[in-house]
Regions:
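Acidic catalytic patch
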Residues: 165, 199-204
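Conserved N-terminal segment of class I S-adenosyl-L-methionine
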Residues: 1-123, 127, 140-147, 152, ...
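Generic structural signal for conserved hydrophobic packing positions in ordered secondary structure
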Residues: 56, 133, 198-200
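Hydrophobic C-terminal alpha-helix "anchor/cap" residues
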Residues: 60, 193-194
C-alpha cells in the first residue's frame, strides 16, 4: 500500500521547483508560425506530429548519434535528443533552421542549413531519420534521397522513413496537398527502400496509434531499414 499523503504536503518544495522552472525559462519560447498555427487552429494535428517522434524516440538507444533530414523548425530533433546521445538536424529552409536555433538550448542538438545532397559530414550516424520529407520529392528524386541518406548511415545503422499514405491524400490539408508530389502505398514504399537496405520492418499509423494493421486503412507509414546495401 502506497501512502500518497507523504509525498504531497511539502508546499515549500513544490514552490521551489516551480520557481526553478521560471528562472530557467523566464521568457518561455516563441514557436515558429507553422507550429503557432497548429496550436491555435488544429492542435490535434500538432500532437499527432509529436506522436510520430515519440515512436521514433522509442527506437533509439542512449548512445545513438542521429541525423534528422528535414528537421524544420527543430521540435522533432529536440524531442529525439532527449532519448539519444546527439542529434544533427539539417534542412534546406534557412528560415526554419534559424527558428530551430532560436528556441533550442540543448547542448546535444545541432542545426545546419544544408541540402542532404550536398552534405559533406565525414561521420557516419547510428540512425538517420526523415519524417514527412519523401512525399515532397518525385519518385526519381526519392531514389537519390534514400541513397544519400544511407551514405551517411553506419554499417550497422538504422534508417527510419515516415510518410503519409496515399490513401490519406483526399483528407490532407490544402497545404499538404499543394506540396505532396508523390505519396506511397506501403508495398511500393517497401520495394523502394529495399533497394537501399537489407531488411525492412513496416508500421502503420492512425492518429497517435502505431500498429501493424491493414495498410490501406492507415493514414501514415513508418518503414525502418537495417543493413545498408
Amino acid at each position: 500500500m502506497i501512502d500518497t499523503g507523504i509525498y504531497n504536503d511539502n508546499q515549500e518544495e513544490y514552490q521551489k521547483l516551480v520557481n526553478d522552472i521560471y528562472k530557467k525559462y523566464p521568457n518561455g519560447i516563441t514557436l515558429s508560425p507553422e507550429y503557432a498555427q497548429l496550436i491555435q487552429e488544429n492542435i490535434l494535428r500538432f500532437f499527432i506530429r509529436l506522436a510520430r517522434y515519440k515512436f521514433v524516440a522509442k527506437m533509439l538507444k542512449r548512445s545513438d548519434s542521429v541525423l534528422e533530414v528535414g528537421s524544420g523548425s527543430g521540435i522533432g530533433s529536440m524531442f529525439l535528443s532527449q532519448h539519444c546521445k546527439h542529434v544533427t538536424g539539417i534542412d534546406v529552409k534557412t528560415t526554419e533552421v534559424e527558428e530551430a536555433k532560436g528556441i533550442n538550448i540543448r547542448e546535444n542538438v545541432d542545426f545546419i542549413a544544408q541540402d542532404l545532397f550536398e552534405l559533406t559530414l565525414e561521420k557516419k550516424f547510428d540512425v538517420v531519420v526523415s519524417l514527412d520529407v519523401i512525399e515532397h520529392l518525385s519518385e526519381q528524386k526519392a531514389h537519390q534521397f534514400l541513397g544519400a541518406q544511407t551514405s551517411h548511415l553506419a554499417d550497422a545503422g538504422m534508417l527510419i522513413v515516415g510518410t503519409p499514405s496515399i490513401y490519406s491524400y483526399p483528407y490532407q490539408s490544402a497545404l499538404s496537398q499543394a506540396s505532396h508530389v508523390k505519396c506511397y502505398d506501403l508495398p511500393e514504399l517497401l520495394e523502394l527502400m529495399g533497394k537501399y537496405v537489407q531488411r525492412t520492418i513496416a508500421f502503420s499509423m492512425n492518429d497517435e496509434l502505431v500498429h501493424t494493421g491493414h495498410h490501406k486503412m492507415a493514414w501514415y507509414y513508418f518503414v525502418i531499414g537495417f543493413g545498408k546495401k
